[in-house]
């Protein structure tokens, strides 16, 4: 039972608690965590199907892998916020982050980031040694190669950042089958090729913000036309990659090809688009739907492979 004073206190602290939770989720980049967990699970699920092992007999592996992946991805996101706290106030997209508003102090952010990374790695190593090592590779690729090195110095920063974004499905696969195989390579390449056109679309929408923050994104350095050609290149590279997964059957290959061709057609329309911002937004939204549908379809078709 609660008395009136307790109820009043609860009502008064409710919005504050909600705000703290919202800021914490922003700190760990929960959207990126969730999307990467989809690809992590896809890699793990594919490994179960390809090795004929039953997932119900290895629920501990699934738990360790998913929690571990969530923690290292969230920890890496928090570390990125810690590193970028000097430029985030400049950009509209990032100026409300808790590291900018002062909600979370730098030492707290660093503590959270390191704690998540350490606990996450312990869980991944509990799943398999290979999963733990790939987790370390992902952390290094995102925190060091991307956040600390290429992001502020090189126009190829998006491509460098795509390495870390392609590792989660490898982590999932390695947790079940450490030897990996063609299936794991296919998922890595698909995710690697998908990311540049996705993030270039976002960069086009935020070109002036990146310019103000002196981040050498491709649209800032080379312009929109060069960016469109680069997006087209990566989508063309993506076209044959689903065929590295022939085990999933003709249904999957047909769906994946349709998704890729739809993206290709939209990319080609960019060269005649009258409103680049509107086109970039359509490309960005399509890329999100593309990734979601593709990886969910891999999970579904793998059951019948």
Curated annotation (Swiss-Prot):
Coiled-coil ranges from the UniProt annotation: none
Biological process according to GO: heme O biosynthetic process
A GO term for molecular function: protoheme IX farnesyltransferase activity
Membrane topology: Multi-pass membrane protein
Transmembrane portions of the chain: 30-50, 59-79, 108-128, 129-149, 154-176, 180-202, 232-252, 253-273, 284-304
Entry annotated with the keyword Glycoprotein: no
InterPro entries assigned: Protohaem_IX_farnesylTrfase, UbiA_prenyltransferase, UbiA_prenylTrfase_CS, UbiA_sf
Note: Carbon 2 of the heme B porphyrin ring is defined according to the Fischer nomenclature.
Reported function: Converts heme B (protoheme IX) to heme O by substitution of the vinyl group on carbon 2 of heme B porphyrin ring with a hydroxyethyl farnesyl side group.
Protein name: Protoheme IX farnesyltransferase 1
Organism the protein comes from: Lysinibacillus sphaericus (strain C3-41)
Gene from which the chain derives: ctaB1
